[in-house]
Amino acid sequence: MTVELSPRATELAEHARQLLAAGGYNGFSYADLSEKVGIGKASIHHHFPSKADLVLTVVRRHRQQSAAGLAAMQQHIGDDPQAQLSAYVDYWARCIRDGSSTMCICAMLAAEAPMIPPEIAAEVRGYFQDLSEWLAAVISQGQAKAQFKPEAAAPVEALALMSTVHGAMLTARALGDPEAFQTIVRAAIHRLAV
């Protein structure tokens, strides 16, 4: 299902995404969003009756954008699994370095899973399932092409790499060192290739 939004709702969703990446579900309110966008809370409620509606929309958009981004990257790079993994982690390295997105919103929301509405938690799980399946497919292709020699089955390696990528985001944030992300994830990819 594609999420279609008006220009104002798109603007609200994008600012909400930034607030989610910075502080998670409980880290912002409609008052914060109102201040950031420069409209009243009533106008926000017109587009998104509740915070849960807003965040669910943001997560669905993130999921769609991620899937489209991975597909476009694969099409651009071609059939080179190692280059695909490198491009994936390089994307996040750039986002962390330039500050445009220092943390995946789904990672932030996953940490809050017991406290967020179930429909949002389900969408977050879907994001991680999608990503894990993509990573497993890339790792399997890399194994078939003798680019990777994983120690475990591709789905297990995918979960490990996914956990490493999101943990590296957290580490880079905690240390205040964007380069820590790249160092950690490059080591993980190197272990696959050895």
Question: What are these model-predicted stretches?
Answer:
Residues A83-Q84, D98-E119:
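Amphipathic alpha-helical segments used for helix-helix packing
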Residues A107, A152-T171, A187:
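Hydrophobic alpha-helical segments that form the core
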Residues L5, E11, H15-T57:
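Helix-turn-helix
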Residues T57, R61, A71-T102, A154-L161:
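Hydrophobic alpha-helical connector segments
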Residues Q82-A83, A122-G126, A144-A160, E179:
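All-alpha amphipathic helical-bundle segments outside canonical DNA-binding/catalytic cores
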Residues V55, V59, R63, A121-S132:
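Amphipathic, non-transmembrane alpha-helical scaffold segments
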Residues T2, A83, A87-R94, Q129-Q141, ...:
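C-terminal peripheral helix-coil segments that are non-catalytic and often amphipathic
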